[in-house]
């Protein structure tokens, strides 16, 4: 029999815990040791989920560090820069938020954009683990909730009020990086309308670390990414002025579904821990508004969700994992939801005959936009597998959740904890020793 190189669950959990300790800077965990040597917002939430079974206290520190960098307007920035650490571009000097943005924190260097709001899920997982521990651990988790409830509410209120000004139930993004799915085909047509002016010179860091160009965005794409920063800097990151200057403005259906779920989760926490009634009421209202906003985007026949280009005033139809946003938050009529599940489990996605594992590729293998090695244009992301599995379990789809967890662990059993994986061969790609991949494994293994 051929030798099976995979690790047992016990070995895998030990390696994942060791990885998180290795990436720990003391009060923050780097997203990855080389490519991402700082704290990323949604990475930090997933890291806290992975830390919770190991140490509720350390998981609380992770979220405390992130929230200490929250902007005065309520935004949680997508990067909190580690002090004295270089090696990532664009760094704090390029963002210049400390000198330009009135709302930026004075004690931390951050980026000037945001990322998906998965943090309430992390808070819930921390509280769930704390309930199984001793009194002192429960006290740590509950003290965190007391200390940070107002900050979590400001975060959700900023998204609901500043990024959904017309109350359509969909979050507007001003940069593809805000979606977390940086170079997804979802944004191709919106980026095509971004025409860079004269950019200050720059030297990328990502393609020095990941030398295979098929795994990373092109230089032309990077020019557009950086031009959007210049547009933001020109108005000093002012929420009121961004809509009048940004050449990238899209309503992100996947971000909006996550926000709906997060509002629902935070409302339930608020009820359980007797937070102000007005806060809980707002959270339930936002959960419903964004659930309805997601459903409004869906195809009448298949249930597939679409993004919306605000400037071009058109729907963005692409075959990516974001199509399945309504499966996260619910709200679809029964027949449409059944059709969407059939699409997910059929040959265009998880049921494609050539997939190494029955997992959700970031872009459909039958799409003309599919590139099996390139970032969000095809590879399978363990963190996305975790998110769908967790949401499916929450919705009562125990068998679907179990299958995703089972296949996710099979994929991760090589022990590389890669950022993403080639969908046909299972080859680990992108950054190795990725913290949120280790975190997903730790949560799955309990």
UniProtKB/Swiss-Prot annotation:
The catalysed reaction is: (2R)-2-O-(alpha-D-glucopyranosyl)-glycerate + H2O = (R)-glycerate + D-glucose
Q: How is its activity regulated?
A: Activity is not dependent on divalent cations, but it is enhanced by Mg(2+).
Q: What is its EC number?
A: 3.2.1.208
Gene Ontology biological process terms in this record: oligosaccharide metabolic process; protein N-linked glycosylation
One of its Pfam families is MGH1-like_GH
How does pH shape activity? Optimum pH is 6.0 (tag-less variant). Optimum pH is 5.8 (C-terminally tagged variant).
Question: What is reported on how temperature governs activity?
Answer: Optimum temperature is 50-55 degrees Celsius (tag-less variant). Optimum temperature is 42 degrees Celsius (C-terminally tagged variant).
The molecular function terms of the Gene Ontology recorded here are: Glc3Man9GlcNAc2 oligosaccharide glucosidase activity; glucosylglycerate hydrolase activity
SUPFAM superfamilies recorded: Six-hairpin glycosidases
What domain of life? Bacteria
**Gene induction:** Up-regulated in response to nitrogen shock.
Q: Its quaternary structure?
A: Homotetramer. Dimer of dimers.
Q: Which family would the database say this protein is a member of?
A: Belongs to the glycosyl hydrolase 63 family.
What job does this protein perform? Catalyzes the hydrolysis of glucosylglycerate (GG) to glycerate and glucose. Involved in recovery from nitrogen starvation by promoting the rapid mobilization of the glucosylglycerate that accumulates under these conditions. Can also hydrolyze mannosylglycerate (MG), with tenfold lower efficiency.
Q: Provide the protein name.
A: Glucosylglycerate hydrolase
Q: Which organism is it from?
A: Mycolicibacterium hassiacum (strain DSM 44199 / CIP 105218 / JCM 12690 / 3849) (Mycobacterium hassiacum)
């Amino acid at each position: 029999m051929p030798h099976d190189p995979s690790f047992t669950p016990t070995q895998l959990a030990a390696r994942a815990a060791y990885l998180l300790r290795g990436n720990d800077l003391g009060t923050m965990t780097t997203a990855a040791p080389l490519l991402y040597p700082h704290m990323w917002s949604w990475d930090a939430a997933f890291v806290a989920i992975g830390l919770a079974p190991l140490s509720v206290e350390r998981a609380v520190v992770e979220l405390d560090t992130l929230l200490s960098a929250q902007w005065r307007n309520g935004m949680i920035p997508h990067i909190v820069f580690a002090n004295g650490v270089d090696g990532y571009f664009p760094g704090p000097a390029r963002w210049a938020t400390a000198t330009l943005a009135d709302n930026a924190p004075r004690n931390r260097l951050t980026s000037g954009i945001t990322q998906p709001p998965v943090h309430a899920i992390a808070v819930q997982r921390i509280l769930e683990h704390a309930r199984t521990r001793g009194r002192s651990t429960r006290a740590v988790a509950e003290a965190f909730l007391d200390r940070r409830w107002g900050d979590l509410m400001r975060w959700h209120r900023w998204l609901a009020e500043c990024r959904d000004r017309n109350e359509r139930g969909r979050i507007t993004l001003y940069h593809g990086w805000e979606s977390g799915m940086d170079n997804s085909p979802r944004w191709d047509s919106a980026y095509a309308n971004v025409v860079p002016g004269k950019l200050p010179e720059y030297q990328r860091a990502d393609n020095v670390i990941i030398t295979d160009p098929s795994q990373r965005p092109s230089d032309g794409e990077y020019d557009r990414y950086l031009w959007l920063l210049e547009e933001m800097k020109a108005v000093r990151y002012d929420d009121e002025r961004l809509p009048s200057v940004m050449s990238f403005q899209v309503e992100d259906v996947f971000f909006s579904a996550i926000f709906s779920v997060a509002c629902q989760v935070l409302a339930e926490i608020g009820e359980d821990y007797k937070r102000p009634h007005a806060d809980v009421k707002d959270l339930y209202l936002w959960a419903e508004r964004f659930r309805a906003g997601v459903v409004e985007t869906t195809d009448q026949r298949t249930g597939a969700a679409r993004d919306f280009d605000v400037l071009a005033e058109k729907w963005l139809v692409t075959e990516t994992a974001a199509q399945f946003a309504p499966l996260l938050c619910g709200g679809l009529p029964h027949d449409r939801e059944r059709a969407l599940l059939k699409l997910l489990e059929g040959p265009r996605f998880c049921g494609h005959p050539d997939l190494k594992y029955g997992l959700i590729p970031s872009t459909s293998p039958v799409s003309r936009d599919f590139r099996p090695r390139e970032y969000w244009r095809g590879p399978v992301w363990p963190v996305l597998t975790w998110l769908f599995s967790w949401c499916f379990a929450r919705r009562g789809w125990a068998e679907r959740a179990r299958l995703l967890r089972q296949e996710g662990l099979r994929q991760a059993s090589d022990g590389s904890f890669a950022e993403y994986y080639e969908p046909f061969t299972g080859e680990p790609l992108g950054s190795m020793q990725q913290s949120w991949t280790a975190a997903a494994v730790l949560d799955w293994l309990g």
